[in-house]
Every structure is written in structure tokens, then in C-alpha cells.
């Protein structure tokens, strides 16, 4: 990260064009911990049948984002944190509809690009000045509060933050 800035300040161009791995880390984090656990909903416009089951027009469907984004049919080793899944050379292997932290298709979140920019900018600024470590309660698999509508750690987001004093 420090190779991209000598002043400790990040500009738009750096965040957008130079931090490819940060983009991959952001996408993988959103795959494992989507902000909304079931916010993608759709309503049937017409009656239809799927695998022998009839659905009437107006039926509402909620997409289980958390489960789909961890499904081994779509993601090899789905619980493994692997930012390389989103490397450009792996793009052809991705099943685009299985990744939807901002929804999918023509009705996806209109703020997706802005949210990604803000997430990357915040993470870049954090890692420039701080070292982040998991607290003792967060070692291993992070459990999500199953009653929450948004991704919320079950045992609190305990993080140890250490200022990097010898830099900037």
C-alpha cells in the first residue's frame, strides 16, 4: 500500500486504478459477509411453474444471500477467505449470479459503485496507518447473528487496532 503513496494521502485515481488486490479483498469480504443477509427480493409478474411447483403472480421471493455466497456448488472451498477468486484471470470461472452483496441484474443497488469506492478508500486509509488484529473472541470462524437483518458478528466485532508509528 505504501508504494502507492508517499504522503499518506490517497487520491481517487489511486483507489480506483492501482489497488487491484484491495478490490479483490473487498469483494471476498462481501461474499463471506454480505451487508444485507436477505435483502434481495423479487416478485413474480406472472403465474409460473418451477420443478413441478406452481407459483402465482405476486408471489414474493427472498434470496438467501448468505447461503448462496457460501454454497460449494458455486464457490470451491466456500468458507476459505480467498481474494484470488476475484482476480482478473479467474473472472471467467465466476458464476456472476452467485455473487450479489448489492443484488443482481437490472435492479441491483444503484449505489454499488459508490459503496465499493467508499469501502476501498476506508480500508486503504486504515491499513496505511494501523495494524488490525482479531481480538481473542474472534479467532477462527466468525459466527453471524442469525436473527439480524444485516451481517452482525454474534460475539461482537472485537478488533485490536495498533497505530503504525514508524510510518507517515
Segments the model singles out, each with a brief description of its role:
Residues 12-20, 109-113, 149-151:
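Conserved, non-catalytic sequence blocks in retroelement Pol enzymes and Pol-derived host proteins
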Residues 1-7:
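Juxtamembrane membrane-interface segments of multi-pass membrane proteins
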Residues 29, 55-58, 81, 105, ...:
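Hydrophobic, well-ordered secondary-structure elements that form the walls
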Residues 16, 33, 49, 63-90:
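Conserved cytochrome P450 K-helix/beta-meander segment immediately N-terminal to the heme-binding cysteine loop
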Residues 60, 150-168:
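C-terminal helix/juxtamembrane-tail motif
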Residues 88-119, 143-147:
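Cytochrome P450 heme-thiolate "Cys pocket" and heme-binding signature region
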Residues 113-150:
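Cytochrome P450 heme-binding "Cys pocket" and the immediately downstream C-terminal segment
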